[in-house]
Amino acid sequence: MTQHDRLLIIDFGSQVTQLIARRLRELNVYCEIHPYQNVTEAFLKGFAPKAVIFSGGPSSVFAEGAPMPPACVFEMGVPILGICYGQQVMMHCLGGKVERGHGTAEFGRAFVTPAEGRLAILDGWFEDGREQVWMSHGDHVSQIAPGFQVFGTSPNAPFAITADPARHFYAVQFHPEVHHTPKGAKLYENFVKLAGFKGDWTMGAYREEAIAKIRAQVGDQKVICGLSGGVDSSVAAVLIHEAIGDQLTCVFVDHGLLRLGEAEQVVTMFRDHYNMPLIHADESDLFLGALEGVSDPEVKRKTIGRLFIDVFQKHAADVGGATFLAQGTLYPDVIESVSFSGGPSVTIKSHHNVGGLPEKMGLKLVEPLRELFKDEVRALGRELGLPDSFIGRHPFPGPGLAIRCPGEITREKLEILRQADAVYIDQIRRHGLYDEIWQAFVALLPVRTVGVMGDGRTYDYACALRAVTSVDGMTADYYPFTHEFLGETATRIINEVQGINRVTYDITSKPPGTIEWE
């Protein structure tokens, strides 16, 4: 199996550390994020990075117990890039000086101008005399460490870009990973080129290596996979099936809360097209019965999550002799489980997942996607031959339409919601907008309104259209449809869907709102 060169990102707590990894993965460089407290001398020997990046972070080098890397990292003889707090750490550790931010803090857009000398990591920069960057710092470097030179300055950061070219140590006070630093990607490209990375970490290579790993892990044992019809579980299932064939059985739990025709699409694709052993468990009566009279969104989510585990266990037992459970865990999930802070956070919404299943069922985990980001999963899906129409689908929540139907759920409401959602998505596709939007759906509101159709009075439901743009789902903006589009869509829904006589458009961003209504 090919051994790829690895880049280590030491995380000091920045909110945008994952973006560093994303930028490097886009360059076909394999990298991992590890919190600073886990990076010991023994870890570094085992990981053997070809280069290291220090992330930014909210701390001050003056704080008691301030996050620091092990001293031996500077003796490894590999290129190091320090970003924001990472720059301050480098200067602090190597003999420079950092001062507290009194009137010199910079937050937001700034412009860096070049200093004397040429630096290979800045190839392609300063062609127009200065570069826009994104700053977010309180403290600042006041004296650079021995061996370092200044290669770029900003009004409040005289050492915005510094380097010790002989040791291949580079440090910047800004964040090259964010889109607000337009040439940040070029800086990363130059850094990995200087470090000697070949850019050989592709989805084609990942596919071959993942298949070999799955075969080595599973042997001749049986694997069960909870198939939701979403991108993650689908790509995991196709990859595992390619590795071990009919040793894999998928269990598709239909809770009666799916979109129009969705269950049939999943069964057709995986049973008929991919010829996978598939148990289609239609448990809609069980789920809808348990949700009868329930209006609290947290109770809805927890009821669905509990029943899902019960149903999955029951049908998985029918497989008999399974040793492994496959899950579509992604790299952001892994990062968060070993996060910088490890501290508790407020539960905004309970997540519907099968996290408790392995312990309950005594199964070992197969997680073939745990090294990938979402966009890489989609690329792997294309590599595996899944159709773009499936790979490019918008995210769909585990509890399904239950959380797009605020208030009590009934079969009648669900059918109205399915029909309205199908019309809305059809409109978006007809206008060529689907791929511009992160997520779009209809929420059926627990409100009836008076209307007039023909010569008669109506008293039907109102619905809300939702469409947002986002990069990762953590923040989102509403999509700016034209009034013509909204008017045309509202007319179609009211004319084609019996039970709705009023259509609204939700223009709330996240934050303060969430993408889903519940």
From Swiss-Prot:
Residue ranges occupied by any GMPS ATP-PPase domain in the UniProt entry: 201-393
Enzyme class: ligase
Entry's Gene Ontology molecular function annotations: ATP binding; GMP synthase activity
PROSITE patterns, alphabetized: GATASE_TYPE_1, GMPS_ATP_PPASE
Cellular compartments per GO CC: cytosol
EC number: 6.3.5.2
Reactions catalysed according to its record: XMP + L-glutamine + ATP + H2O = GMP + L-glutamate + AMP + diphosphate + 2 H(+)
Pathway connected to this protein: Purine metabolism; GMP biosynthesis; GMP from XMP (L-Gln route): step 1/1
Keywords recorded for this protein, A-Z: ATP-binding, Glutamine amidotransferase, GMP biosynthesis, Ligase, Nucleotide-binding, Purine biosynthesis
Residues annotated as catalytic: C84 (nucleophile), H175, E177
Amino-acid positions noted as binding ATP in the UniProt annotation, renumbered to this chain: S228, G229, G230, V231, D232, S233, S234
Domain Glutamine amidotransferase type-1 intervals: 6-200
General function of this protein: Catalyzes the synthesis of GMP from XMP.
Subunit architecture: Homodimer.
Protein name (Swiss-Prot/TrEMBL): GMP synthase [glutamine-hydrolyzing]
Annotated gene: guaA
